From Swiss-Prot:
UniProt remark on cofactor binding: Binds 1 [4Fe-4S] cluster.
Keywords assigned: 4Fe-4S, Iron, Iron-sulfur, Isoprene biosynthesis, Metal-binding, Oxidoreductase
Domain of life: Bacteria
Obligatory cofactor(s): [4Fe-4S] cluster
Function: Converts 2C-methyl-D-erythritol 2,4-cyclodiphosphate (ME-2,4cPP) into 1-hydroxy-2-methyl-2-(E)-butenyl 4-diphosphate.
UniProt record similarity statement: Belongs to the IspG family.
Name of the molecule in the record: 4-hydroxy-3-methylbut-2-en-1-yl diphosphate synthase (flavodoxin)
Reactions catalysed: (2E)-4-hydroxy-3-methylbut-2-enyl diphosphate + oxidized [flavodoxin] + H2O + 2 H(+) = 2-C-methyl-D-erythritol 2,4-cyclic diphosphate + reduced [flavodoxin]
EC class of the enzyme, as a word: oxidoreductase
Keyword Amino-acid biosynthesis: no
Length: 369
């Protein structure tokens, strides 16, 4: 039952990616990217539907050639979530997906080609109200910047980004967001900090090629957590060598931990020790699996003993503290004693009842408003 986040977000210009606002006073958007073959329309649509069920706001799709562009058009007709087309090298692919209804173009103006080709892409985006993401990556810096700096640095990333920002602004195009990603946490954080002071456009955060599920989660939580805590960031993507659905889950968990955005259960659980009166780890695993479908933001504390249990339980919407017997707290007050028999079943029932109650209360406030 914690309050609003104390974080003051950086002021930025609001743009729209399809129906999703990005920047300004909009909630921080959670993005992911498909890892299926774009030409396999059925598989890609199925993956996007799973991402949408997990709560994704925006999905990026790689479009490497014209065949993939045509597949993108078919995919776009079959899903509801806004789609970003990831385009490199061939400007004609960007023009084609613009015709097919793309919600955002992710390009690097530096590898699209001559000025007239960049202008053609920008004109197509402007005519159709399509925003652009300038995506700068430490692994693909321009050769002159590599030569100037000797290696990727925060300053090199920012110089590349500003070069592309100026390019779009010369063409009088303002609906864009920017990212300056690196796999090194310190480099990425320093680059975003520098860039945030120099432009007003929304910033898309990410630690690129972060790693597998565990290592990538840790890297992303550290890097993005530092930036988000400073108010920097308008969209996030957790890059994991894992099921893309995990990217969405981790993204929401990072935002929940900073009280920037809530979706579903925020669990507070002890790591357990010999004082526990019930199996905390088993209980948590079962609850997380059973309650994945709940979208209502609730704090649920699961603490195995009476050392910290009552204090944590009193701060949660629903709290369980181990003892003889165990004790359930609801809205900070002792409500029910429980034995270990059917502990998870009863706790699930109470959480679902609380979620339904909160949903009804929120709906009532909206109606009265």
């Amino acid at each position: 039952m914690h309050g609003e986040s104390p974080i003051k977000r950086r002021e930025s210009r609001k743009i729209w990616v399809g129906s999703v606002p990005v920047g300004g006073d909009a909630p921080i958007a959670v993005q992911s990217m498909t890892n299926s073959d774009t030409n396999d329309v059925a598989a890609t649509v199925a993956q996007i539907n799973r991402l949408e069920a997990a709560g994704v706001d925006i999905v990026r799709i790689s479009v490497p050639d014209m065949d993939a562009a045509e597949a993108f058009g078919r995919i776009k007709q079959l899903v509801k979530v806004p789609l970003v087309a990831d385009i490199h090298f061939d400007y004609r692919i960007a023009l084609r997906v613009a015709e097919l209804g793309v919600d955002c173009l992710r390009i690097n103006p530096g590898n699209i080609g001559r000025e007239d080709r960049v202008r053609a892409v920008v004109d197509a985006a402007r005519d159709r109200g399509i925003p652009i993401r300038i995506g700068v990556n430490a692994g693909s810096l321009e050769k002159d910047l590599q030569k100037k700096y000797g290696e990727p640095t925060p300053e090199a990333l920012v110089e590349s980004a500003l070069r592309h920002v100026e390019h779009l602004e010369r063409l009088n195009f303002k609906d864009f967001k920017v990212s300056v990603k690196a796999s090194d946490v310190f480099m990425a954080v320093a680059a975003y900090r520098l860039l945030a002071k120099q432009i007003v456009q929304p910033l898309h955060l990410g630690i690129t090629e972060a790693g597998g599920l565990r290592s990538g989660t840790v890297k992303s939580a550290v890097g993005l957590g530092m930036l988000l805590a400073e108010g920097i960031g308008d969209t996030i993507r957790i890059s994991l060598a894992a099921d893309p659905v995990e990217e969405v889950k981790v993204g929401y968990d990072i935002l929940k931990s900073l009280r920037l955005r809530s979706r579903g259960i925020n669990f507070i659980a002890c790591p357990s020790c010999s004082r526990q009166n019930f199996d905390v780890v088993k209980t948590m695993n079962e609850l997380e699996g059973r309650l994945e479908d709940l979208l209502v933001p609730l704090d649920v504390a699961v603490i195995g003993c009476v050392v910290n249990g009552p204090g944590e339980a009193k701060e949660a919407h629903i709290g369980l503290t181990g003892g003889t017997p165990n004790l359930i707290y609801i809205d900070g007050k002792p409500a029910q004693k429980l034995t270990n028999d059917n502990l998870v079943d009863e706790l699930e029932r109470l959480i679902r009842e609380k979620a339904a109650e909160k949903t009804a209360a929120d709906a009532s406030v909206i109606v009265r408003g």
